[in-house]
Regions:
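Conserved DHp (HisKA) dimerization/phosphotransfer helix of two-component histidine kinases, i.e.
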Residues: 1-39
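Conserved catalytic submotifs in the C-terminal HATPase_c
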Residues: 40-52, 87-89
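Short conserved segment of the HATPase_c
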Residues: 101-102, 114-125
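Short beta-strand-loop-beta element adjacent to the nucleotide/active-site pocket used for signaling
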Residues: 82, 87-105
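Detector for a conserved hydrophobic position within an alpha-helical segment of the HATPase_c
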Residues: 145-146
């Protein structure tokens, strides 16, 4: 089982780093969400347009944010609001390395919150709060963010869940 999980969680292709604009990535996630959940799901954005581009794998970053946002939309039954927000961070330590400049990406929703029973284990493989869920979405998101030397964390209560992704803009 351990071997199978490792194969499922390992990217099927090598990381392809290119210069990417985080807002283009978030807009792609936004368009995918609105197509998948047409109707009463609102996806708001609050972007810091002064953020520089970063070097990363575009597809991995899209998948990481999409997994988080899709979980939120599913938890809300396709209704409610998801907000995507970016900010710059200065002089921050990520994964034991110090960076002069990083970016903070928040995926926020007004859904039911993450159940207490899974909150401490939500990034583990096969942990899902949804009937029929694979329990791999957040694990994959965490792996992809870590591939980019970033961090991911979550604060959740009923009516307000925030996933915060911090990514370095420049190499350590």
């Amino acid at each position: 089982l351990q071997d199978l999980m490792q194969r499922l969680l390992t990217p099927h292709r090598a990381m392809l780093p290119t210069t990417v604009n985080i807002h283009e990535i978030l807009e792609r996630v936004r368009s995918l969400l609105t197509a998948e959940f047409p109707g009463s799901l609102a996806v708001r954005r609050d972007y810091d347009t002064s953020l520089p581009e970063l070097v990363g794998d575009r597809e991995q970053l899209i998948q990481a944010v999409l997994n988080i946002a899709r979980n939120a939309a599913q938890a809300m039954g396709g209704e409610g609001e998801i907000a995507l927000r970016t900010r710059s961070l200065r002089q921050v330590t990520l994964a034991k390395k110090r960076y002069r400049l990083a970016m903070e990406i928040k995926v926020m929703d007004n859904g039911p919150g993450i159940p207490d029973a899974i909150r401490e284990r939500m990034f583990y493989p096969l942990v899902s709060g949804r009937e029929g869920g694979s329990g791999l979405g957040l694990t994959i998101a965490q792996n992809f963010i870590q591939h980019h030397h970033g961090t991911i964390n979550c604060v959740s209560r009923p009516g307000h869940t925030v996933f915060t992704l911090n990514l370095p803009v420049e190499q350590a």
